[in-house]
């Protein structure tokens, strides 16, 4: 493992460092936050699941909502519990210990590119199970850097631990069995390119 890869791994293991460097590289997530504000219904008391919530970087957007954040990383969840409002649980997105039809909407940011197609299907099936009929999923996932000139974006993908960064068509194919795509787009967040899809079950 190279020096840069070790640095990325070290940063990823520490919630405060992770938030700081990701915010720096992604312009404080302004583009991501704008899409969340547009596509999810915020502050209306809705039951919302932030799946793969990490250290809770977007919890502040859901003030007034019944927010549950779930992540497999206990350090991230401990940090979120100390610093954010909401309920935060350690959990495997492929097999959620949550009741059927518990949520009105789900945010998935930067989770599925860590998972194989089989595991991604398991996550989407769980999302469909815990959502009410007609519930929304906003999935924002890493895609290969759009511009060849985005050297830092290419470098980050080469060392980042997401082993399943997919082209857009692969995400669309995976989503099609579980939900209808209401709106989708490519967006740039700092040096990172994402595919954002608003899905309706």
Positions of predicted regions on the chain:
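Class I SAM-dependent methyltransferase SAM/SAH-binding core
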Residues: 49, 54-95
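C-terminal alpha-helical "lid/dimerization" subdomain adjacent to the S-adenosyl-L-methionine
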Residues: 139-193
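Short catalytic micro-motifs in class I SAM-dependent methyltransferases
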Residues: 110-114
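Conserved alpha-helix/loop element of class I SAM-dependent methyltransferases that forms part
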Residues: 25-44
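Class I SAM-dependent methyltransferase Rossmann-like catalytic core
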Residues: 2-31
């Amino acid at each position: 493992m190279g020096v840069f890869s070790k640095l990325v791994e070290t940063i990823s293991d520490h919630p405060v460092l992770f938030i700081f460097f990701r915010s720096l590289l992604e312009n404080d997530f302004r583009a991501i936050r704008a899409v969340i504000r547009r596509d999810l219904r915020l502050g209306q008391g809705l039951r919302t699941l932030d799946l793969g919530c990490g250290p809770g970087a977007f919890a502040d957007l859901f003030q007034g909502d019944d927010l549950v954040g779930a992540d497999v990383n206990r350090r991230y969840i401990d940090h979120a519990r100390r610093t954010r409002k909401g309920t935060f649980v350690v959990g495997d997105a492929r097999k959620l210990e949550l009741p059927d039809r518990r949520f009105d909407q789900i945010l998935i940011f930067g989770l599925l590119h860590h998972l194989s197609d089989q595991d991604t299907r398991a996550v989407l099936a769980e999302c469909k199970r815990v959502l009410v009929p007609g519930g929304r999923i906003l999935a924002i996932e890493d895609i290969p850097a759009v511009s060849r000139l985005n050297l830092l974006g290419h470098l980050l993908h080469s060392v980042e631990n997401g082993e399943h960064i997919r082209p857009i068509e692969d995400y669309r194919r995976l989503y099609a069995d579980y939900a209808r795509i209401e709106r989708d787009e490519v967006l740039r967040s700092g040096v990172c390119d994402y595919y954002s899809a608003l899905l309706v079950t």
